Amino acid sequence: VKEEQISYKYKRNEDIQMIITKTPFRMSFFGGGTDMPSFFQENGGAVLSTTFDKYCYVNVRHLPRFFDYSTELSYSKTERVTDVEDIQHPAIRNAMKFLDMHEIRLTYEADLPARSGLGTSSSFAVGMLNAFYALKGKYADKKKLADEAIYLERELCMEAGGWQDQIAASFGGFNRINFTDEGYEVLPIIISPERKKQLNQNLMMFFTGFTRFSSDVQKANAAGKVDKTAQLKEMLSLVDEAEKVLTDKSISLDEFGRMLDHTWKLKRQTGSAVSTSNIDILYDKGIKAGALGGKLLGAGGGGFLVFYVQSDKQSAVREAMKELMYIPFNFEDGGTRVIHYTPESYEPLV
């Protein structure tokens, strides 16, 4: 009898639906911090960023009723629950309630570690919402996914932060994102393929490791509750300058690297969490080896250092950074997408 019930529920094994979404991580070059509503609603904001070919994958399907739990989640740990309210992961719990999801199995995997300064949590939020809509058989465009990921993280999960990560993960590509009191707009950077390729080749990324900086960062963050409006306004003006460097062929691309160095120094002046001694030492090593400038992407649980390096200096920078993992990457334009979609005949009972 049991076998008949099962075959009735799933006419064929391939009728069990599975969705896999693929969502890129982002690197932000200029304007970080001006994407906070507390700043841009009064002053306007803008960010220059790109997504690149490192992704997170969210696999979602309905969970067959063979188990004494109705939802199974697999990320850095495994959760098995019968009630959505019992889910520990805030983003998954709130997203499931928000979109009225029940009886699912969700698996998260990523090319790079979480909490490492690449907007990983927002890429996950966007990819998860994309997968949930696909599971429901509904289409959600990039703006809807970005807006709802912002709402999920900032309102439902009450996590502090800006808006740029969710927008970048959703839309993909090399963009200028403008923020006003009325919302945001995503404007692709008009740069020739050759120049974009050259920029990509001149950027080198290194992983600094996980926990070295977290206590320094927490102390600095606690002590750093000062007004940064003037600094953020200067960061905002740099977005215009950086965009001009990228789009104007008469300007050397090396200016982009020098501007990264300028921003680094600007951030240092505020005594922000960026200026931990270990990272300063690594940054200075890179500059001494020939990098024109660089940027720490994130801090806390870990981080990535990106340097702008002319081709003839790259081997020297690799040697100077030999203690760190080097991560080659390419820019990408796709944003979040569904890469596997199997329709199903199974209906959850809830």
Q: Where do the language-model regions lie?
A:
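Short, Lys/Arg-enriched N-terminal segments with co-localized hydrophobic residues
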Residues: 1-17
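C-terminal nucleotide
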Residues: 13-30, 35-37, 41, 47-49, ...
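Core catalytic loop region at the nicotinamide-binding pocket of NAD(P)H-dependent oxidoreductases
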Residues: 103
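N-terminal pre-triad scaffold of radical SAM enzymes
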Residues: 106-114
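Short aromatic-hydrophobic micro-motifs that form the base-stacking/packing surface
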Residues: 116, 295
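DPxDG-like acidic metal-binding loop motif
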Residues: 118-138, 142, 170
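Glycine-rich active-site/cofactor-binding loop and its immediate structural neighborhood
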Residues: 302
